[in-house]
Amino acid sequence: MKYDIIGDIHGCLQEFQNLTEKLGYNWSSGLPVHPDQRKLAFVGDITDRGPHSLRMIEIVWELVIHKKVAYYAPGNHCNKLYRFFLGRNVTVAHGLETTVAEYEALPSHKQNMIKEKFITLYEQSPLYHVLDEKRLLVCHAGIRQDYIGRQDKKVQTFVLYGDITGEKHADGSPVRRDWAKEYKGTTWIVYGHTPVKEPRFVNHTVNIDTGAVFGGRLTALRYPEMETVSVPSSLPFVPEKFRPIS
């Protein structure tokens, strides 16, 4: 099987359409379909900050849950939206406010439909996907070699948030260790979470979050070709969001 793994979309629907078309997908059915049966995989954070978060929920639900032709691994923004939909006490900030504004503008029956779709998508998706006979792993923020195969709380924190130190940057965002430099495995780990200006290949890991929602690009990794394909963002460039790992 061949896969096209998509970086953090964050509600950037137009960029997602542009990227999938560039990858050879046809949207005539209303969903991206590849003539060679390639499958899409999402590294999470499909919502928040961008203009079309709810439409992205519908598309990913349709592909992953209804048609079962794609893969989705939740990100930290997905986890927070999930908790919001469950009625938990979450701070509506750091991008969640844009998704909530879209949601609250809907009539109640459409709100319920979106909520049910996202809760189902989140609950039926694993923390990470191991594909191609363990040669490929798709997750949100990365994973340590010794965590592969585990699903416990420590692993959940790592795949959602990265290798956080507990310290904070001046803007309140967490300081993260560069786990990829220590990775010695042969399974390719494809992830996002931390915006980088160019796709970052380190050992057998690839960070494909090129900051579409911050004016960078939306990037896909074609597997097993190991080629990256990108399209430019339509949003303003925010250089301070492209931070070094540590």
Curated annotation (Swiss-Prot):
Keywords: Hydrolase, Nickel
InterPro entries cross-referenced by the UniProt entry: Ap4A_hydrolase, Bis(5'-nucleosyl)-tetraP_PrpE, Calcineurin-like_PHP_ApaH, Metallo-depent_PP-like, MPP_PrpE-like
GO molecular function: bis(5'-nucleosyl)-tetraphosphatase (asymmetrical) activity; nickel cation binding; phosphatase activity
The protein's required cofactors: Ni(2+)
Keyword Hydrolase among record annotations: yes
Signal peptide location: none
Classification via PANTHER family: BIS(5'-NUCLEOSYL)-TETRAPHOSPHATASE PRPE [ASYMMETRICAL] (PTHR42850:SF7), METALLOPHOSPHOESTERASE (PTHR42850)
Family the entry assigns: Belongs to the PrpE family.
Protein's recorded name: Bis(5'-nucleosyl)-tetraphosphatase PrpE [asymmetrical]
Top-level taxonomy: Bacteria, Bacillati, Bacillota, Bacilli, Bacillales
